[in-house]
Amino acid sequence: VKISFLINNIYGIGGTNRTVINLAEALAVRHEVEIVSVFRRAASPKFVISPRITVRALVDLRPGSADRGAAGSKEPSEVVPRQEEFYAQYSRFTDERIIRELRRTDADVVVGTRPSLNLFVAAHTRDGALRVAQEHMTHLAIPPAVRAEMARVYPRLDAITTVTEADARSFQENTPIPGVPVVGIPNSVPEPVVQPSDCTHKIVVSAGRMHRIKRYDLLIRAFAELAEEFPDWQLRIYGDGGEAGKLRALVTELGLNGRALLMGGFSPIESEWAKGSIAAVTSSAESFGMTLVEAMRCGLPVVSTDCPVGPREILRDGEDGFLVPNGEVEGIAWGLRRLMADEPLRRAMGEAALRNAARYDPAAVADRYMKLFEDAARRRAAAVRGYRAPSGPRKAAAGTATVPPAGIGATTVDVTADGAGRLHFRADGPAEGRHRRQFVLRHRPSDGNRRPDLPLPTSREQLDNGGTRYTATLGPAALDELGDGRWQVTMRSPKSAPVHMKAGLRDTRALIDVRERVVGRPPSGPTTWNLPYAQPNGRLMLRTVLREEHAECTAIEIGEGVLTVQGVLCGSRTVEPGALFVVSRRGQHGRNFAAPVQLLDRRTFRAEVPLRRVVDHRLERWEDWDWWLQPDPDDWRKTRVCHLLEDFPDVKGAYAYPSLPLVGDEDSEYSVSHPVRPVWVRPYCSASGAMAMNVVDR
């Protein structure tokens, strides 16, 4: 059977793209599958797609393409209703391309994936193909004018699917389509490669786009209610979007800086779910609830609002999580408290979540779709003379929906940190042949002084699908060669240039425990740290840390004109009575100010820095003041205060500290040429991990 999925833009990101790819890859084990994207705006899809699946685009909108500005591209679509969400993207030109594709397709089944495309599928797909509409949006969220057009055109369909049973009922009640079955089939989520969470790390995880419908404000407020009761717990929210600024302001307002972290986008997300012990979903509406299933497949119990329509069909309340009232901070806090206070309950519910989420495996969901197609074919054969249901030979089962990548550059590398200073690399690549490929680390210097490449001893294993599995381990001893820096993770053979590899899973959860040990018992020797991370272009990098001595920042508080810093000294020295915390103005007009240090023990310190001294001695409108610790008043040597030891790369973004306004002093060195105005002081962590603060005259 040949199955064709028609999608808006497979080259972008989004829940529909991800679920269509999951289903397509499961169907591709036994059938011929293609994904036809209306638009193409990038060289390659953001999500990895199995080479089994053919990917084509109808309209190429990349710079320089002939389709940009083509005849008819400025004229409105005659098929897509004006009220449809993506109406502005469509035109008479796109109408022509889509209709031509549907009339010429040789697919046995054509599946549309949003209302605009389903209208095309219903009205223009050739008669010999089954027409199926996937509805990923909650039915009543579709504008009434679009639903009216669906009611007019959808009777030509053979089947309609929604992602929940509740939405299937809503569809039938509000937009009945005589003679066309509406079936609830959930989205699928593959079993993660990452090991499930053991529910011991005191982290609440949430993930999704930063949009008001996700109601992260409720989650942050609920966590704030519990912050004093559970001082060692942390909230991590992953995602990008327009609400991030408001949420940062709320974190500051509630005094949760360093406790509630906005982590930004992260892919693949499975390794971040597995770091947590509780997943939280606080949306006001969810058409399905992919994040619930993703978290459950990683072994997390879920606290979710009982919002329409997905969560109540996914969660088994009291067994693998808690459903709490929609829109209520108190209910969310109640659910979180139940799990934060009871580790055995977390573990039991996490194990139940792992079992219960198996019903969303792509193979199981693909079987339901095949039954839907077969039932539709029987109905069509009974009603339409001359129609022949597809009955060609199926592909031989390969046991898995994956095949080797077409080239080494398309291969992703998974990395696991084991907590003992080792990183384990794994990549499933193309057939090895005579290449003798191996992992090689290439230095990416900040000063132009590049160090020699470091080849890693690499093992190779032939896979059943004809590909090759490459594995290597980087041990702590290698840091003597790597030193402090950033390294590209590449693969090369004796006869080929290095290829910078794509980042897959980065399972760094073991580093959470390592940081806790280091902060609790700072090392008396050098500090080492290996952290894999992905560049914005998706390529895999390694951040290596080798410091003979540094002060690791563990807490920052900003009060009325006072900055309070707490940290531990790592290295051979100890913090002596009379030690000083030093702030130093960067640049050619350097100046130092020192504050006394309070000793909490021989390696742990606390300092209170009066910010007025810095503000009143500024010389420029924008200044940076670096932080140092002088552990011994009789030894002039200072050591840098840093925030290096985390399990994620963007410390600066996650720990976004607020700005404190101070009024400039009329007698300051700077007020001679500028009148008194507010001066803002903000601590930050630089990209190198060094702590500093901005002093800005606005």
Predicted regions span which residues?
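Conserved acidic donor-binding segment of nucleotide-sugar-dependent glycosyltransferases
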Residues: R316-G318, F322-V329, R338-E343
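N-terminal strand-loop element at the rim of the active site
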Residues: I7-I13, A26, R30-F86
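Basic, ligand-binding patches in group-transfer machinery
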Residues: A382-R698
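Aromatic "clamp/platform" in nucleotide-sugar-dependent glycosyltransferases that forms part
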Residues: G265, S284
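A short, well-ordered alpha-helix in the C-terminal region of glycosyltransferases
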Residues: G331, R338, L345-R359, R368-K371
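Donor nucleotide-sugar binding/catalytic pocket of nucleotide-sugar-dependent glycosyltransferases
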Residues: A133, L140, P155-V193
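Short hydrophobic beta-strand element within catalytic cores of glycosyltransferases
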Residues: P301-T305
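A conserved mid-protein helix/loop that constitutes part of the nucleotide-sugar donor-binding site
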Residues: N17-N22, K202, S206-E228, G242-A249, ...
